Amino acid sequence: MIPLRVAEISQLSLGELEGRGEEITGVQVDSRRIEPGDLFVSVGRGVDFGEDALARGAAATLVPTRPFEAFAALGRAVRNRSEARVVGITGSTGKTSTKDILAALCAPSARTVWAEASYNNEIGVPLTLCRLEPDTEVCILELAMRGFGQIADLCAIARPDVGVVTNVGPVHLELVGSLEGVLRAKGELVASLPAGGTAIVPEEFPVEREDVEVVRLLPEPEARVEDGRTLVGGVSFNFTAHHQAANAAAALAALDALGLPRPERVDVEFSRWRGEETPLPGGGLLINDAYNANPVSMKAALVHLAATAGSRRRVAVLGDMAELGSGAPSFHEQIGREVARYGVEALVAVGELARGYLAGASGVATTRWAADAEAAVPLVEELVEPGDCVLVKASRAVGLEVVAEALAAVSA
């Protein structure tokens, strides 16, 4: 981290600041991760662990009066001292995967910091900025959208030079009302770019600014799968999922905007629960995509299931898709029809909204319903047979990773 003096933090009047250190060289919210010189920011129950943080070597502890404002001030202070080029990534789907791909592309040729997991909100973005070192050249941020103004607020802290909108689809409709609302909210990233910045956006995305370079993404970029890898833009990637090609194209556009060279071959380490593949008994396969779901990503996952399964029986364990507003029942029924269309032979629907999958999935040979993830575990364990190809996917709140973990344990 670019060091900050404790006295400077004190002058920001962010809350109750304690400690004997003169300089902080890191920021943590988990006392177990404290290293000497860190600032421990107590959030929620973290207030109980201040003494533990000091004992582990923290330079100071902060109990913020207004947590979001405190994190914003810390992130802004570090960002203002950094000469790194910042890339902000948002979109209805693919944000984290695009971030992971871009990080793998940049790392060989530039000192790069990128968001851990899905550190994409008012706490996660500043925490990522607080990892910038004096010699950091590129910072890759993921920007969440849970309503109007959030992306603009995050951009005010991060000041991205390059903005990537991966795609726009029906997500967070409870918060923004319509697809037009999603466009408006995502457009805050483009509006926040500096003159001379680069906006990388879907083909039909409206951009009114004339003082930024606009790169438009094709919905189906040219890609070729061979020998278990995918070739996009002259770069060989270690994945075969069809939807990742679009994420790779977006990442390559950002790489070009940064002026960095394209490597010939890249092995991406994707964040957990985003299409992780685990062998199952009898030549079966588990596709753990349980981190999140919406209609766009759910269809993409079903396409991947169909392409990957081959002659194996296709099993889908699908949970609720959250924040779809009044159209939620219709969206779930539409996905149910996609389940049937892509040849799924056994479907387990998890959650109240997931009943809609069953309504749309006429023709699927075997269907089951469970109230929650815990109740789904025994149903899935009974249903899955050796040699099956199993997709597990739902919105984050469903917690469907417990099903994936139960299946993976069988193969351990």
Which residues are covered by each model-predicted region?
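N-terminal leader/targeting and accessory segments in enzymes
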Residues: 1-77, 308-309, 324, 338, ...
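Residue-level signal for inorganic ion chemistry
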Residues: 9, 38, 53, 74, ...
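Acidic, Mg2+-coordinating active-site environments of NTP-dependent enzymes
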Residues: 12, 16, 162-285, 311-312, ...
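Mobile, glycine- and charge-enriched loop segments
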Residues: 33-40, 130-139, 305-325
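Active-site beta-alpha connecting loops in nucleotide-dependent enzymes
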Residues: 45-46, 271-273, 282, 290-363, ...
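Short acidic-hydrophobic, aromatic-tinged amphipathic segments that line or gate anion-handling sites
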Residues: 62-65, 367-376
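Phosphate-binding loop of NTP-binding sites
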Residues: 67-198, 207-211, 405-412
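Short amphipathic alpha-helix with an adjacent loop that forms part of the alpha/beta core around
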Residues: 377-383
